[in-house]
Amino acid sequence: ELVSEFCLKKERVCEDSSLTISCPEGEGIVIYDAIYGRKRGEVCPGLFGAFTKNRKCRSSNSQQVVENSCEGKSSCTVLASNSVFGDPCPGTAKYLAVTYICSFL
C-alpha cells in the first residue's frame, strides 16, 4: 500500500507530556512509526542540556504501546513517560514522536 507523504501526519511531545492525536469523524488512526527516546539532539533538550548523554536511543516497545492505545480509533492520548514506555536511556531527555495517517474505517 503506497501512501503519499502528504497524507502522513507527525506529532511530537517532550517527556512527561501527553500526546493527543485525532482524525476526522469516520476515519481511524493508522500508526506508521512511533519512537519514545531520542533521535535528534535539538529536540526537547531538557534541563541543562540533559540530552547530551545519549543522542540516539529508543524504547523497543514504542510502536506497540502507541498502536495498542490508538490504532483504529478516531482519537487517542498517550503519555510520553518512562512509566509507560520504560527508560531506554537513563539521564537523557526523551520525547515521543508519532507518524500516522487517518484512514476511512
UniProtKB/Swiss-Prot annotation:
It is found in: Cytoplasm. Disulfide bonds: none annotated. InterPro entries: Lectin_gal-bd_dom, Lectin_gal-bd_sf. One of its GO terms (cellular component) is cytoplasm. Keywords: Cytoplasm, Disulfide bond, Lectin. Residues 13-103 form the SUEL-type lectin domain. GO terms for molecular function: carbohydrate binding. Pfam families: SUEL_Lectin. Its main location: cytoplasm. Homodimer; disulfide-linked. This protein binds D-galactoside. May have an important role in the activation of eggs (triggered by fertilization), or in their subsequent differentiation. The dimeric form is essential for hemagglutination activity. This is D-galactoside-specific lectin. It comes from Heliocidaris crassispina (Sea urchin). The lineage of its organism: Eukaryota, Metazoa, Echinodermata, Eleutherozoa, Echinozoa.
